[in-house]
Amino acid sequence: MLFRSKKIGFVEKEEILTKREWIDRYKVFTPRANNIGTELNDDNFNTFVGEPGTICTESYIVLGANLGLDYESAENLRKYFTTRFARFQHSLTKASQDATSKTYQFVPLQDFTPSSDINWAKPVADIDRQLYEKYGLTDEEITFIENMIKPMV
């Protein structure tokens, strides 16, 4: 199954020329164009888990394909990108709506498994608090992030 901007289609596996090894893995797809780090409302709502057998066009960025994720871990990765913490880190390198793999360079990699030091079963606001504590953020830094990055509704 092929995901592209606002459409789903099918393509033969033999037609895939790059990163074929990602096809049969869990991964997360997030739109390449998003408003994180811009003055516009954040619209990172279209991030979703790509199950084995799925691919995407350049309309999306693939996250976690090399992490050996199962469905639960992929869902935790997807949830991570709804946190203010991760979206703030992502915003640090963005000058426009366009995102590339390089715009994720300051987003720290986490353990997305059930044995993680982060309890991914909690609501996003609680996950943010766990991340703030893990990275030793001050009250001033937390306030700055929370004033700059709106919560996902």
Whereabouts are the PLM-identified features?
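Polybasic, glycine- and aromatic-enriched phosphate-binding surface used to engage nucleic acids
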Residues: 1-120, 124-126, 133, 147-153
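Short acidic, low-complexity intrinsically disordered linear motifs used
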Residues: 130-142
